[in-house]
């Protein structure tokens, strides 16, 4: 019995670690910087990538942390569905503002298309979240792989197992059901691929 309890504890610890490492804000940092550097070179790409991250991830996540600190949100993953729509709407407005800034900075088409895909993904996720709890972690993971595969290299598809790992983690810690994770992954990859194939 103690061995089974220990195994369960280990799985949950691993699931929480995966949840943090594969959180949307981390993935936004990764994908914006990779796409920006790939399309604009090291120096300019890094600068533009940081600008894109600020509007797409940094600012919204900062507001989430403030909300948690003030007791307005349960946690930084916003586990309660009813708390998500307002934050996601604010994030959507922030990303749209980022698009305007990137256009003004004459950002590369690939980076601009990436942020357009983020806007579309957020809009769809917000619509679903208004009545059902979708896995934003799974959507972000699948969307990240799709974006990197289309905008940088198909070799990035080799990271697809990380989407499965992320889904497992969210189910293991009981933040989502398998269906919520599966729908999140489908929405994330589908919206990203659809938008990029039209815009990029």
Regions found by a protein language model. Name each.
Residues 1-15:
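Short, Lys/Arg-rich, polar N-terminal cytosolic tail immediately upstream
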Residues 15, 74-91:
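Juxtamembrane helix-capping/reentrant segments at transmembrane boundaries
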Residues 18-38:
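The first (N-terminal) embedded transmembrane alpha-helix
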Residues 27-29, 89-100, 139-142, 187-188:
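Core segments of transmembrane alpha-helices
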Residues 35-47:
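Short, hydrophobic transmembrane alpha-helix segments
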Residues 44-59, 117, 147:
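Alpha-helical transmembrane segments
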Residues 66-73, 99-112:
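Transmembrane alpha-helix boundary signature
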Residues 108-200:
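Membrane-embedded catalytic cores of phosphoryl/pyrophosphoryl-handling enzymes
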